[in-house]
């Protein structure tokens, strides 16, 4: 069965509309007083105060609870409405409500809202006439009951006094609003133009930075290509040097063991990584110099044993 929650939705809509009306009333009052304000700050402060008052006073929960009771009755569940009826007719409830009313009267009096203002506000309401500046004063049910009970009297000592009505210069009001509008329009245009200029500068800087990045990337690509070519040339040169040394080694009158040892050292050279290849060359040269040094020491010892001397030329 479809549940009806139209009353709760209407109550929630009324509460939300009341909040929006409070925000509009606050901002319009500040504008009429010529006070500059931040809309977001006003909205946040009114929202915080409104939520606190509605929650702390229990008004929102009371309204939503009554709306839920009505929706339950519309859905065929009358137990909650019967409990509310019994609660409203209980003597303790009446006494408690009477006590709350007295507290509210004392609170209103302490705030400067006297009995005359409270009674007049309870007896009359003002209805605006659509499309006109005039309004209609309506009597409430309390006023009707007071008339029926004879609690309304006409003051014979009332003296009609002339009311001084200030003539509103609508043209000056319009001109003032127009000047304010033009001033606000100019400020908005200035801010917008400044924003456009800043956005253009940011866009130009971004384009310039993008061009620099593109140039740097192209330069990096060129260096990478050159580095790859240089690496291939070094690999080719190292390979040709090894081949040349091997060919030269085969033409020498050295023993096969020595040739084999040198060829093994040459074959161990890294042809892929030039840095490692230079390290291998350094190792081979160190070994050759070390072998030459040992041969020279042996030759020097033989000369000394044979009582020969040697000189460098």
Curated annotation (Swiss-Prot):
It comes from Rotavirus A (strain RVA/Human/Japan/S2/1980/G2P1B[4]). Keywords: Coiled coil, Host cytoplasm, Host-virus interaction, RNA-binding, Translation regulation. GO terms for molecular function: RNA binding. Residues 208-313 are annotated as: Interaction with host EIF4G1. Transmembrane segments: none annotated. Residues 166-237 form a coiled coil. Its main location: host cell. CDD domains: NSP3_rotavirus. Signal peptide: none annotated. This is Non-structural protein 3.
């Amino acid at each position: 069965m479809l549940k009806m929650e139209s009353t709760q939705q209407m109550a929630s809509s009324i509460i939300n509309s009341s909040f929006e009306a409070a925000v509009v009333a606050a901002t319009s009052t500040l504008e009429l007083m010529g006070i500059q304000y931040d809309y977001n700050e006003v909205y946040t402060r009114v929202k915080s105060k409104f939520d606190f008052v509605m929650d702390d006073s229990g008004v929102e929960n009371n309204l939503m609870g009554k709306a839920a009771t009505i929706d339950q009755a519309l859905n065929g569940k009358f137990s909650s409405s019967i409990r509310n009826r019994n609660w409203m007719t209980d003597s303790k409830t009446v006494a408690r409500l009477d006590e709350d009313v007295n507290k509210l009267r004392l609170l209103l009096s302490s705030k400067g809202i006297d009995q005359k203002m409270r009674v007049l506000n309870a007896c009359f309401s003002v209805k605006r006439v659509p499309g006109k500046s005039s309004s209609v004063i309506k009597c409430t049910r309390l006023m009707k009951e007071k008339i029926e009970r004879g609690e309304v009297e006409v003051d014979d000592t009332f003296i009609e006094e002339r009311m001084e009505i200030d003539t509103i210069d609508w043209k000056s009001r319009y001109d003032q609003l127009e000047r304010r509008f033009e001033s606000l329009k100019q400020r908005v245009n200035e801010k917008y133009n400044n924003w456009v200029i800043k956005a253009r500068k940011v866009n130009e800087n971004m384009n310039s930075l993008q061009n620099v990045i593109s140039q740097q990337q192209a330069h990096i690509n060129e260096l990478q290509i050159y580095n790859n070519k240089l690496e291939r040339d070094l690999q080719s040169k190292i390979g040709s040097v090894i081949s040349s040394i091997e060919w030269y080694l085969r033409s020498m009158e050295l023993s096969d063991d020595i040739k084999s040892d040198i060829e093994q050292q040459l074959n161990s050279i890294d042809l892929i990584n030039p840095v490692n290849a230079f390290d291998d060359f350094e190792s081979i040269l160190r070994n050759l110099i070390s072998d030459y040094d040992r041969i020279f020491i042996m030759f020097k010892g033989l000369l000394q044993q044979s009582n020969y001397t040697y000189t460098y030329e």
